[in-house]
Curated annotation (Swiss-Prot):
Active-site annotation: 327 (proton acceptor), 328 (proton acceptor)
Binding site for substrate: 237, 259, 262, 328, 361, 415, 420
Cofactor(s) this protein requires: Zn(2+)
Cofactor note: Binds 1 zinc ion per subunit.
Cysteine pairings via disulfide bonds: none
Organism superkingdom: Bacteria
HAMAP family (alphabetical): HisD
Residues annotated as binding Zn(2+): 259, 262, 361, 420
GO terms (BP aspect): L-histidine biosynthetic process
The protein's name in its UniProt record: Histidinol dehydrogenase
Pathway(s) it belongs to: Amino-acid biosynthesis; L-histidine biosynthesis; L-histidine from 5-phospho-alpha-D-ribose 1-diphosphate: step 9/9
Family per similarity comment: Belongs to the histidinol dehydrogenase family.
Amino acid sequence: MKFLDIRDTNFDMEFAAILARGEETGREVEQVVLDIIADVRARGDEALLEYTRRFDRLEADSVASLQVTEDEVDYAFARVKDEEIAALKLAVERVARFHEKQKQETWLSTGEPDILLGQMVTPLERVGIYVPGGKASYPSSVIMNAVPARVAGVGEVVMVAPTPGGEINPHVLVAARFSGVDRIFRLGGAQAVAALAYGTATVPKVDKITGPGNIYVATAKKLVFGQVGIDMIAGPSEILVINDGSGTPAHIAADLLSQAEHDELASSILITTDRGFGERVAAEVERQLAELSRETIARRSWETYGAVIVAGSLDEAIAFSNRIAPEHLELAVTNPFDVLPKIRNAGAIFLGHFTPEAAGDYLAGPNHTLPTGGTARFFSPLSVDDFVKKSSIVYFSESGLNRLGGGIVRIAELEGLEAHGRSVSVRLKGEGEARK
């Protein structure tokens, strides 16, 4: 963990190592993924079975046998505690309610009597969601990806999840049913992404792929983009807490560790105007680390990519936050609503001392699929918009074209596109009418 002062002349150099985490995919990883994608395109189901045996140690006679049955989902419900089922159902309901507010309708503008303009909103036909199944199991990832797709009106939601040993976590299956997932395959890695992007005899081709995964999954999504849509290239998780010396150090420490436990590349940063408060938080982090079941992962993350930064003022802390555009931003300050208008770049913003980032991860309502690695400068959280497409609608009556046609022709002429202009002028002059 680095204890830094933003006013030090060497601050940028010392902080650079944290900003650079996970930047290099590596040519070796990219080549491996390219080979897998090409193999799945060429051999389809046969390649999927081979990679599933190799990476997930799962023997299967066919890809069809890797599809989860309704009976298996029923059995998952029998294995999950009632209170856990209730919590997952509540999360789905709250996430659905929030995303309903994001829906856009098709609209038409009738402001001109002879011209009609508008926008048609159409749900995607089929999407694929990737649910990680590595060091932890994430039913919340199912909810955050499938629910907005369902709210958007997507026709079919296909889920893939790696299953070392052949079994999908029962909580993931419960979340999938509540979230409206149609089909689930025990497939993971770059090969699952390739199958969704190009389709095989068994796995249907989708229009868009969403959901987080390891470096191979992220690289595969990047490489198939253009063949299908993707949500974003997600990097390691991160949290930045802005603090003015108010609040409880134990609370801030717990919030920092909530990100550190994700993986060794996660970054947890506190920037505070009170050095003493920062020191108390750092000490509390050390105390709490020893209590975590995922201590090894969290400790590596904290020691390598954690930081406590002292700022000269709250405005200086805010400027720093806007510069790095964190995935998760907590405003652990006395008056968070005064600070909020000054925030320009953040994936999700959590206000006050009783709004831990974990609330947003699970059931507050907003999506937890957020831009990482500074991309909150230009990317947004996953939303209903990611599962629809928009088409422009244009209608000109004869009088409308007569009214605006001259301007269209002139712009076509100045661009040197004669046929463009003729497609209008031939109508204005009535040419071709005699040749009907």
